[in-house]
Curated annotation (Swiss-Prot):
Main location: host cell
Organism listed in the record: Human papillomavirus 28
InterPro entries per UniProt: E6, E6_sf
Protein name in the entry: Protein E6
Location of this chain's protein in the cell: Host cytoplasm; Host nucleus
Assembly mode: Forms homodimers. Interacts with ubiquitin-protein ligase UBE3A/E6-AP; this interaction stimulates UBE3A ubiquitin activity. Interacts with host TP53 and EP300; this interaction inhibits TP53 activity.
Residue ranges of coiled coil: none
Note in the entry: Belongs to the low risk human alphapapillomavirus family. The cancer-causing human papillomavirus E6 protein has a unique carboxy terminal PDZ domain containing substrate but low risk E6s do not possess this domain.
Annotated GO MF terms: DNA binding; zinc ion binding
Zinc finger extent (unnamed): 27-63, 100-136
Family (UniProt): Belongs to the papillomaviridae E6 protein family.
Length: 146
């Protein structure tokens, strides 16, 4: 039965006959209704809809950030440079799915290349490779004036 349920927001809208603007999803973590901006961000991050008791759920921005922090703290395994990840997995980083450990967006080629070129490590968290997207990279490297 789970295989027949829509896995993303676009398929959910199509299969249920509800327009994106009329879609209302609750957050799986805090149960609040996602705003239109949060629904858009959820879709753009290519996150899957979660099904509980026959109902679809998403995740709000605040809970996604919090869950990323919790997962990083509880489930961080180790970190490697891009070359180390490629050596360990026997695959080019370009063919692997790597998500941002902060916002969960899949990294695009340019973001993966930036990790390689600027010698930034990727992190194995709960068995999956994670890095920083462009937005979170800038957010994490902001210098606070003294």
């Amino acid at each position: 039965m789970d295989d027949q349920r829509p896995k993303n927001i676009f398929l959910l809208c199509r299969d249920s006959g509800i327009s994106f603007d009329d879609l209302r999803l609750h957050c799986i973590f805090c149960a609040k209704v996602l705003t239109t901006a949060e629904l858009s961000a959820f879709a753009l991050r290519e996150l899957n809809v979660v099904w509980r008791t026959g109902a679809p759920y998403g995740a709000c921005a605040r809970c996604l950030l919090l869950q990323g922090i919790v997962r990083r703290l509880k489930h961080w395994d180790y970190s490697l440079y891009v070359e180390g990840v490629e050596e360990e997995t026997k695959q080019s980083i370009d063919t692997q799915q790597v998500r941002c450990y902060m916002c969960h967006k899949p990294l695009v080629k340019e973001e993966k290349d930036r990790h390689r070129n600027e010698r930034r490590r990727l992190h194995c968290i709960a068995g999956y490779w994670r890095g920083s997207c462009q937005y979170c990279w800038l957010r994490c490297t902001v210098r606070i004036p003294q």
